[in-house]
Amino acid sequence: MKNQQVRELTVMAVIAALYVALCYAFAFMSYGLIQFRVAEILLILTFYNKKYCAAVILGTFIANMLNGPYDMLLGTLATVLVLLIVLLIKNGTVKKIIIAPAAAVINGVVIGLMLYYIFEIPEALLVCMIDVAIGEFAVVLLGVLIFAGIEKTNPKVIDIIKSIGANIRRPQNKI
């Protein structure tokens, strides 16, 4: 039992760290008015196992430290709202595509308002919202398509993703 909990915690830490690393590696396009936050692709993991929600939320919170307390609070809130929708949507590629516009609207509104009012970005409020929404839509849709491709070409990868913390037996080569 303890080994399984350690394995789960380790996987969660790796996902949170990957989210942060992707944001920082692509910081030039992960923050600001025009955002293509590649790390948002990790939202799709939560379709396969709801336990990944905590890792994505933690990763978002840590990554948003770069932008200060408002982004830590509001950016993380936007992620929580998107993940609540994910939890309501059942599996299936067509249903997963719904998350792209939902994430775009939520992030467009929340982050757009934050950029306009708190960070005082001089563009019009609607421009702030639309710019953020376009990037979010593109990245999340890309994530849905990537994972749909993985499901078709290598479903065992998806089985591993679904079975976080499970005792997965790997085939051993017998010589």
How would you label these PLM feature ranges?
Residues 1-54:
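Hydrophobic transmembrane alpha-helices
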Residues 17, 58, 100-103:
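Short alpha-helical scaffolding segments that buttress acidic/His motifs in well-ordered protein cores
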Residues 39-42, 55-63, 81-85:
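Hydrophobic, membrane-inserted alpha-helices
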